[in-house]
Amino acid sequence: MTEVSSLTGRLLVATPALADPNFDRAVVLLLDHDEEGSLGVVLNRPTPVDVGDILEGWADLAGEPGVVFQGGPVSLDSALGVAVIPGGGAVDGAPLGWRRVHGAIGLVDLEAPPELLASALGSLRIFAGYAGWGPGQLEDELVEGAWYVVESEPGDVSSPAPERLWREVLRRQRSELAMVATYPDDPSLN
């Protein structure tokens, strides 16, 4: 098997051609990617459920909108916390209960007391479920043209307007991808 170049910390942006309704115009932050598979969370699928309804202690730390996001179609009954540490979270200064994924972005131990992290977190999102791919599956989807792979920015995790994130991420690209942001929601109405 060939070695897999890690895409951990990067974004998968669904191409307009991706037909899976779970990922229509999705922006996925890859939390882990190696030869054993990939795991990520969809950053732009807010649910109507308030964070306080399922994780009361974390509600005050959740960014706006303060709702749970559907992280993907796998394990919808599990919760993941993704947070940004202001200043990039220096290696020796990473707070207890937070594990770096990429740069200032990391996973939060939701079993830890929220007050342990309250002063350290810049923004927090809670996700129900995740997106997962088996060995080689994501690579196959990339070859098929289902996803664009782009760099993430810490603000992507806590976008106050998640419904605009797909277009915003594409617009900031310095390539022909910026033009894809203008693609109509329903091309048949064009």
Regions from the language model: what does each represent?
Residues 1-190:
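A short aromatic-anchored loop/beta-hairpin motif
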